[in-house]
UniProtKB/Swiss-Prot annotation:
Belongs to the vitamin-B12 independent methionine synthase family. Pathway: Amino-acid biosynthesis; L-methionine biosynthesis via de novo pathway; L-methionine from L-homocysteine (MetE route): step 1/1. This is 5-methyltetrahydropteroyltriglutamate--homocysteine methyltransferase. Its cofactor is Zn(2+). Keywords: Amino-acid biosynthesis, Metal-binding, Methionine biosynthesis, Methyltransferase, Repeat, Transferase, Zinc. 5-methyltetrahydropteroyltri-L-glutamate binds at residues 17-20, 117, 515-516, 561, 605. The gene is metE. Zn(2+) binds at residues 641, 643, 665, 726. Pfam families: Meth_synt_1 (PF08267), Meth_synt_2 (PF01717). L-methionine binds at residues 431-433, 484, 599. It catalyses: 5-methyltetrahydropteroyltri-L-glutamate + L-homocysteine = tetrahydropteroyltri-L-glutamate + L-methionine. Catalyzes the transfer of a methyl group from 5-methyltetrahydrofolate to homocysteine resulting in methionine formation. One of its GO terms (molecular function) is 5-methyltetrahydropteroyltriglutamate-homocysteine S-methyltransferase activity. The lineage of its organism: Bacteria, Pseudomonadati, Pseudomonadota, Gammaproteobacteria, Enterobacterales. It comes from Escherichia coli O157:H7 (strain EC4115 / EHEC). The active site is at residue 694.
Length: 753
């Protein structure tokens, strides 16, 4: 029984973000469709070859996506919303881009599909839309075309296909409501057709992803698995693939399925390998997800060997990444600025492939010498002074309940804030960032590369902040922001100014579409050596009589959008960050900043996948926010911002944050999200986002007014704010001016009644 290895997927964007650049060039009309397609082919060929050279036996095909793999699956099944369809019924790459972005080089612009987080990761998918009576058919053959590509290059491949039940689970019904699970029998023939086509190509194994099987699914959904997979069996071997959690709670459902193998995440799940082995059918292959696909840490391979060795030789076994390597940067070897000690602690996607090769070889041979050598740096890290800061640990241990309480309740604070700011009804503001122009990016890059001295850099940033204030005053906004010209990313910026973080040069991971982020890495205890945001906030406030918001990223979001340590709990990291940012709130307040926004867009996405684990997480997540904010005086207004959220099941926790104002992303869901706040009788102020900043389309005054009137039916108008869904850094100035002008006009119209 020779053990093989494989990955569940590989990063798509390219080491230098080649895919992002090609997409954006095509969208801007600066390159042709053929040129875009050529970049995709080149990246796929390179990535297959890199995995093969690193020692991977079975290469994933179908993990590449032009925007998002859930959207790719939707097109495969012919699931195209009516507003995005081509007149002749055909489907092409622009159809895909219109669904994702609301517009493309061809076709009519229309509202983009809703976007939300992929399970509890920082990747986003486009939510499939279902309407009653819709038809499904194989319309987008990208998977088959890419399999042909890989086979022509001589690779041994394993196609990757998002499973039918997970795909349905991830979608939403639009219009007349019905049970979306009723569509299952309509999509299975398309899956059968795809599997038949793969069988014709001589494919032995297909990785069929059903991560919904790690959730606490309703019984009807669990019951749907057996008939669905009865319909799919027989043409190729199916590797039922799960990740992000363990499968033990749903193992009875899984073991009844007519599949030939099961992949389990042995990093994030709590499944015991020996118990799994006992419960799985003896002829099934077990794919052991031993290498963390979601983090950047070098694996302790001696530990991984011990974890799996007891079942070696007892069943067919593969070793694998826990999930797709999509969530990891590509290659550590190009990181030239990390010092040798810290660099020795990490492994990116290509290094994880190498880890899988080392592990496979050791399991096949029994020789573990190479594993011990590989694991030595991560074992040495446990005693590094770079990791432990006694002062931080002491401060954390001294936290009391009082440290997470504002001095007075919201009603008292609101009165003090009204007296201080005297804002009109329907106050207008933005979420924080303004367009990151080429000039701004060049300025930061020149400074980073040493081509610009500190004085000239600061002069340049000051000018961009001045322009942002002038623009907002001209537009008539009520509460201003400084625009964040100095910030490359809302998390990276704070990480750069906090001890305990390190940064990469090329550690890009895909967030959605062409958007990539370069998450900081938490390597040790977190503290704040000096004020971070005070200087620029104070400068911006000096230029206007209107209030300027101080802008902070909250502790849970910094945690969730960074690569965390694996040697302490997430709670510990979040509270260390909260204490550091608490000092920032105090310093902003002392500098005369009266409104401070602490963004927590990631609060919900950090939820454990199983509801039974939620309470513990929400308790420390809320406490971290309150530790951060509680130092503020009564007349300092604390805002928070959240996006991509379904709120109804965590409203208690959102209220417990005790922010004076919460701004939320609601426009893509047509204000549906406000139902939760209405039903809960949310007591504080709310700014429901009135337009979608992820699309370049400019909303009309009438559209915004209609949304605000809809909001006012649910929330008293005196508690409503008017703002976009999210920050504006990815937009251009022309559409930003136009959209904000319409937003301000809509608010003014409503004030006049």
């Amino acid at each position: 029984m020779t053990i093989l290895n494989h990955t569940l997927g590989f990063p798509r964007v390219g080491l230098r973000r080649e895919l992002k650049k090609a997409q954006e060039s095509y969208w801007a009309g600066n390159s042709t469709r053929e040129e875009l397609l050529a970049v995709g082919r080149e990246l796929r060929a390179r990535h297959w070859d890199q995995q093969k050279q690193a020692g991977i036996d079975l290469l994933p095909v179908g993990d590449f996506a032009w925007y998002d793999h859930v959207l790719t699956t939707s097109l495969l099944l012919g699931n195209v919303p009516a507003r995005h369809q081509n007149k002749d019924g055909s489907v092409d790459i622009d159809t895909l881009f219109r669904i994702g972005r609301g517009r493309a080089p061809t076709g009519e612009p229309a509202a983009a599909a809703e976007m939300t987080k992929w399970f509890n990761t920082n990747y986003h998918y486009m939510v499939p839309e279902f309407v009653k009576g819709q038809q499904f058919k194989l319309t987008w053959t990208q998977l088959l075309d890419e399999v042909d590509e890989a086979l022509a290059l001589g690779h041994k491949v394993k196609p990757v296909l998002l499973g039918p039940i997970t795909w349905l689970w991830l979608g939403k019904v639009k219009g007349e409501q019905f049970d979306r699970l009723s569509l299952l029998n309509d999509i299975l023939p398309v899956y059968q057709q795809v599997l038949a086509e793969l069988a014709k190509r001589g494919i032995e194994w297909v990785q069929i992803d059903e991560p919904a099987l790690v959730l606490e699914l309703p019984q009807a959904w669990l019951d749907a698995y057996k008939p669905a997979y009865d319909a799919l069996q027989g043409q190729v071997k199916l590797l039922l693939t799960t990740y992000f959690e363990g499968v033990t709670p749903n193992l009875d459902t899984i073991t009844a399925l007519p599949v030939q193998g099961l992949h389990v995440d042995l990093v994030h799940g709590k499944d015991d390998v020996v118990e799994l082995h006992k419960r799985l059918p003896s002829d099934w292959l077990l794919s052991a997800g031993l290498i963390n696909g979601r983090n950047v840490w070098r694996a302790d391979l001696t530990e991984k060997y011990v974890q799996i060795k007891d079942i070696v030789g007892k069943r067919d076994l593969w070793v694998a990444s826990s999930c797709s390597l999509l969530h990891s940067p590509i290659d550590l070897s190009v990181e030239t600025r990390l010092d040798a000690e810290v660099k020795s602690w990490f492994a990116f996607a290509l290094q994880k492939c190498h880890e899988l090769a080392l592990l496979r070889d050791a399991l096949n041979s029994g020789d573990t010498a190479a594993l011990a050598e590989w694991s030595a740096p991560i074992q040495a890290r446990r005693h590094s002074t770079r990791v432990h800061n006694p002062a931080v640990e002491k401060r954390l241990a001294a936290i009391t309940a009082q440290d997470s309480q504002r001095a007075n309740v919201y009603e008292v604070r609101a009165e003090a804030q009204r007296a201080r700011f005297k804002l009109p009804a329907w106050p207008t503001t933005t979420i924080g960032s303004f367009p990151q122009t080429t000039e701004i990016r060049t300025l930061r890059l020149d400074f980073k590369k040493g081509n610009l001295d500190a004085n000239n850099y600061r002069t340049g940033i000051a000018e961009h902040i001045r322009q942002a204030i002038v623009e907002q005053e001209r537009l008539g906004l009520d509460v201003l922001v400084h625009g964040e010209a100095e910030r490359n990313d809302m998390v990276e910026y704070f990480g750069e100014h906090l001890d305990g973080f390190v940064f990469t040069q090329n550690g890009w991971v895909q967030s959605y579409g062409s958007r990539c982020v370069k998450p900081p890495i938490v390597i040790g205890d977190v503290s704040r050596p000096a004020p971070i945001t005070v200087e620029w906030a104070k400068y911006a406030q000096s230029m206007t009589d209107k209030p300027v918001k101080g802008m902070l990223t909250g502790p849970v979001t910094i945690l969730c959008w960074s690569f965390p340590r694996e040697d302490v709990s997430r709670e510990t990291i979040a509270k260390q960050i909260a204490l550091a940012l608490r000092d920032e709130v105090a310093d902003l307040e002392a500098a005369g900043i009266g409104i401070i926004q602490i963004d927590e867009p990631a609060l919900r996405e950090g939820l454990p996948l199983r509801r039974s684990d939620w309470d513990a997480y929400l308790q420390w997540g809320v406490e971290a926010f309150r530790i951060n904010a509680a130092v503020a005086k009564d007349d300092t207004q604390i805002h928070t911002h959240m996006c991509y959220c379904e709120f109804n099941d965590i409203m208690d926790s959102i209220a417990a944050l005790d922010a004076d104002v919460i701004t939320i992303e609601t426009s893509r869901s047509d204000m549906e999200l406000l139902e939760s706040f209405e039903e809960f009788d949310y007591p504080n102020e709310i700014g429901p986002g009135v337009y979608d900043i992820h699309s370049p389309n400019v909303p009309s005054v009438e559209w915004i007014e209609a949304l605000l009137k809809k909001a006012a039916k649910r929330i008293p108008a005196e508690r409503l704010w008017v703002n976009p869904d999210c920050g504006l850094k990815t937009r251009g100035w022309p559409e930003t001016r136009a959209a904000l002008a319409n937003m301000v006009q809509a608010a003014q119209n409503l004030r006049r009644g």
